[in-house]
Amino acid sequence: MGGISIWQLLIIALIVVLLFGTKKLRSLGGDLGGAVKGFKNAMSSEEDKKALEDAEAAKPVQTAQTVQSAQPTQQATEKKPESNKEQA
């Protein structure tokens, strides 16, 4: 009574097909599908960027520790020849 029946929906769909034609409706559906696919790709690439930034933020800390541990080894190597010269 107050709702839309299946017959009313079919009549509206028939009128839309007659007005726009099947080719235009098919291209409209393809455009809409492409837009949804593009939106999903953009959302997933945004998540990938965040994960990549988090991974890059953790890497410099490890690199800085590696450089610091390498410096004392070089200084110890340089001091040994000097101590040998003083003893001779």
From Swiss-Prot:
Keywords: Cell inner membrane, Cell membrane, Membrane, Protein transport, Translocation, Transmembrane, Transmembrane helix, Transport. It is a single-pass membrane protein. Gene3D superfamilies: 1.20.5.3310. It comes from the Bacteria. One of its GO terms (biological process) is protein transport by the Tat complex. GO terms for cellular component: TAT protein transport complex. The chain crosses the membrane at residues 1-21. It is found in: Cell inner membrane. Residues 43-88 are annotated as: Disordered. Part of the twin-arginine translocation (Tat) system that transports large folded proteins containing a characteristic twin-arginine motif in their signal peptide across membranes. TatA could form the protein-conducting channel of the Tat system. Belongs to the TatA/E family. The Tat system comprises two distinct complexes: a TatABC complex, containing multiple copies of TatA, TatB and TatC subunits, and a separate TatA complex, containing only TatA subunits. Substrates initially bind to the TatABC complex, which probably triggers association of the separate TatA complex to form the active translocon. This is Sec-independent protein translocase protein TatA. It comes from Shewanella oneidensis (strain ATCC 700550 / JCM 31522 / CIP 106686 / LMG 19005 / NCIMB 14063 / MR-1). The lineage of its organism: Bacteria, Pseudomonadati, Pseudomonadota, Gammaproteobacteria, Alteromonadales.
